[in-house]
Amino acid sequence: MARQKQAAPIQRATSSELMHMLPDDLPQKHHNGANMGLANKDTTRDKVHEAADAPGLWQLAFCVAGIYASFLSWGVLQEAITTVSYPVHPPTAAEPEPEKERFTFSIVLNTIQSTFAAVTGFLYLYFSTPKGEKVPSIFPTRKIIFPLVLVSISSSLASPFGYASLAHIDYLTFILAKSCKLLPVMFLHLTIFRKRYPLYKYGVVLLVTLGVATFTLHHPGTSNKVAASATKGTSGSSAWGIFLLSINLLLDGLTNTTQDHVFSSPQLYTRFSGPQMMVAQNVLSTLLTSAYLLIMPHLSSTGILHAILPVPIPPSTETELTAAVSFLSRHPEVLKSVLGFAAFGAMGQLFIFYTLSQFSSLLLVTVTVTRKMLTMLLSVFWFGHSLSAGQWLGIGLVFGGIGAEAVVQRQEKKAKAAKAKKTE
């Protein structure tokens, strides 16, 4: 992705909006009747030039392959980091099966990922800016700082809840539920922004919710956990995992709705592109999580934190940075996975923004849905998971609902384009 002239600022809009803007040098309207012949010649020449510059099949294949390769690798590494256990020390004669530990340092993982994303996002922003022009500021106005801080806080808080849920549910349930972002986004739009939705959207939400519930209830380990919890008189740990994941999805929804508000309000915050959001959000997230990791041990050692908070914080949380460094020094193979996870995540975002700059958001919706399905299938085969008939039914309901939404949106977009063409 060499330095090139960007067609137009990439703006993240709602899923039914077209992301690909027309270039600035497209033929302009000529109001002078005497110049109509010259205007027609200019129009013909510009159309030939536009056709020559239009993205082709190989460019489409490059974008799709980049998104698939980046996020499928990212998903495999995420599952390996968060679910695989490692022995605390090598086996000995006295202890042939030593205790095992798992990477549970979500704030550290989030910090590394946001750092990679901020750097790569800035490089994309720099090289996609036309030569001779100033690189767009990631904080163009003072008004935009508050929503950007809110986005960085909500995205930084979402990850710990999501990773904590993996202690109670399996990765397949996690991935399937993460595919259902429409539910919290709609909830927040209805309650905060008083936005109305077409009837089919509620049908999609119903299908997705039923799918996740079906998948969870038919999980082989879920019934065992519920039965064991019933004999103990306690609530099932899988229910607690779903609760933690629900908080994660709600925070993700807050992140997405705030981003939509920024992009759809240029009169308040000026025009703000996708790469600008990527850099600003990840820079602020890195600052917030880094400050937390560095300040938390000092607050803990002085006793100020325990005096303020009514609930005690686990020691592992107070010294997460030290504990994470110690864990990675004991298991250097995990460090490679963490760095690869951050790199693939950042590259995936770059391919998404590049795809949006060359094609429409409709293509991206299709690629995203199929990518999530492939992530689940890759997890099944890579890590040897087995799925029951009920779980396959749940997966079918979820992706059937998401796919139906994509089809309806595509038809709506075609209808709008046809109507606009008739009025020209």
From Swiss-Prot:
TM stretches of this protein: 57-77, 107-127, 144-164, 173-193, 197-217, 234-254, 293-313, 337-357, 380-400
Subcellular location(s) per record: Endoplasmic reticulum membrane
Highest taxon in the source lineage: Eukaryota
Principal location: endoplasmic reticulum
UniProt membrane topology term: Multi-pass membrane protein
GO molecular function: UDP-galactose transmembrane transporter activity; UDP-glucose transmembrane transporter activity
SUPFAM superfamilies attached to this UniProt entry: Multidrug resistance efflux transporter EmrE (SSF103481)
Keywords, alphabetical: Endoplasmic reticulum, Glycoprotein, Membrane, Sugar transport, Transmembrane, Transmembrane helix, Transport
GO biological process, one term: UDP-glucose transmembrane transport into endoplasmic reticulum
Glycosylation sites: N256
Pfam families named among the record's database cross-references: UAA
InterPro entries linked: SCL35B1-4/HUT1
Gene Ontology, cellular component aspect: endoplasmic reticulum membrane; Golgi membrane
Family assignment from sequence similarity: Belongs to the nucleotide-sugar transporter family. SLC35B subfamily.
Biological role: May be involved in specific transport of UDP-Gal from the cytosol to the Golgi lumen. Involved in the maintenance of optimal conditions for the folding of secretory pathway proteins in the endoplasmic reticulum.
UniProt name for this protein: UDP-galactose transporter homolog 1
